[in-house]
Amino acid sequence: MSFVESWRFAGARRRRQVTPGPATRPGYSDYTQGDSWGEGEGDEDEGCDQVARDLRAEFSARASSETKRAPLLPRVGDGSPVLPDKRNGIFPATAAKRTQARRWPIQALSILCSLLFAVLLAFLLAIAYMIVKELHAENLKNEDDIHTGLLGFWSLLIISLTAGLSCCSFSWTVTYFDSFEPGMFPPTPLSPARFKKLTGHSFHMGYSMAILNGIVAALTVAWCLM
């Protein structure tokens, strides 16, 4: 055998050795297969890929359905869409329209109840005025030209206190429901001290005026009945 033939024979043998064959997984011992950190990594990767594909498909389907349902936005001169103002994750204009459409029966009912309450209050005040007028007119005049009232001290005190408490409670209730957050902001004089510390307010003119209205009403009724 010549040198050239021996070189060709060695090259062909080398090519046969490096020819790729079917890849086989190397065998591991029972210890490495059972207790190693890499056990089932291939299966887990395939499962994660499948979950990721499912999530992508779901998100794409949901996005396409939302774009079909969403109305077309108006466009400006350069062709870009005009996006509505978004505050705190919501669109205030759209949310306001929806809430107004849902709450108009409640608003109408509240207005009707307020009107009925005002009519009832006016009726009660008219009756109270008639009673006070009659009691004020019923005075006795004796022979010495001294006027003597029919009402005693305790009766006069009870009537005046009742009128004052009624006026005070009405003004207090109106101020309470007209506040930003009833009972907390602004706090009432009867609210706990921690509410006053949280809001930073310890004095509210509305509740003070309610108390003042009650005092003035009590004094007015007492003066009229004397």
UniProtKB/Swiss-Prot annotation:
Phosphoprotein is among the record's keywords: yes
Phosphoserine, modified sites: 2, 36, 60, 65, 80
Alphabetical keyword list: Membrane, Nucleus, Phosphoprotein, Transmembrane, Transmembrane helix
Membrane topology (UniProt): Multi-pass membrane protein
GO cellular component: nuclear inner membrane
KW Transmembrane (keyword) present: yes
Region spans: Disordered: 1-49
Subcellular location: Nucleus inner membrane
Acidic residues bias (residue ranges): 38-48
Pfam families: ARL6IP6 (PF15062)
Residue spans crossing the bilayer: 111-131, 150-170, 205-225
Recorded superkingdom: Eukaryota
Family the UniProt entry places it in: Belongs to the ARL6IP6 family.
PANTHER family: ADP-RIBOSYLATION FACTOR-LIKE PROTEIN 6-INTERACTING PROTEIN 6 (PTHR28640:SF1)
Protein name: ADP-ribosylation factor-like protein 6-interacting protein 6
UniProt organism field: Mus musculus
